[in-house]
Amino acid sequence: MKRIVIVCEGPTEQEFCNNVLLPEFIRHGITIEAPAIKHSHGGIVPWGTLRKQLVNHLYESDVHVSMLIDYYGIKDDYKFPGWQESKTIQDKQERMHFLFDRMREDLPAQLQNRFLPYIQLHEFEGLLFSDIDVLQHNFMPYEIDIKELQEAADKYPNPEFINDHPNTAPSKRLGRAICGYDKVLYGNLLAMDIGLEKIREKCPLFNEWIIAMLTTKR
């Protein structure tokens, strides 16, 4: 069975990998391990720290390595390869592809073919906007402002583009619209209910990542 290590930003991403991705990947003969980023205390770390962990995993035998972190949380001083230059690229998907290429190129040449770089545009919670009906059906009318969430979903070409201000990031929208919203618990229950197929259908960059992992060669 093929093995993929996905280094995760935090518990939300780990639960998503274990509860949503893993069952599907096992059907394709692939097992997933989802360790958290080391030395982060929750959240993203500078590229140098993350790179060291990625390289250490890549030196394990017979494994591909990826990552699941939010674009929204990366700071300028984290010095991700190509970060400043990427800001000149207006198309967000092209910007992500540019960053993916720069990250891969920054690893030792002999490891690059087993590295599957990924950054979630703009953050994990954007994936939950893939099916607003699921959000509505999981809460009582007095617990959720479905109008705000539907307007956000309708405003953008796809859920990955939802983010025009720190106060209107997907997680902030969900926190305002859903009473008592818990990122780790609700995030993954909702993702499981929406289903991987629907998320892939609505989120093209995410779907590219899934395809890349499912089609890895030993």
Q: What positions do the PLM features span?
A:
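Catalytic nucleophile-elbow at a beta strand-turn-alpha helix junction centered on a G-D-S/GDSL motif
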Residues: 6-15
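Short beta->alpha junction loops
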Residues: 35-45
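C-terminal accessory helical subdomains adjacent to catalytic cores in phosphodiester-
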Residues: 14-37, 51-218
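Short, glycine/acidic-rich beta->alpha junctions
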Residues: 46-50
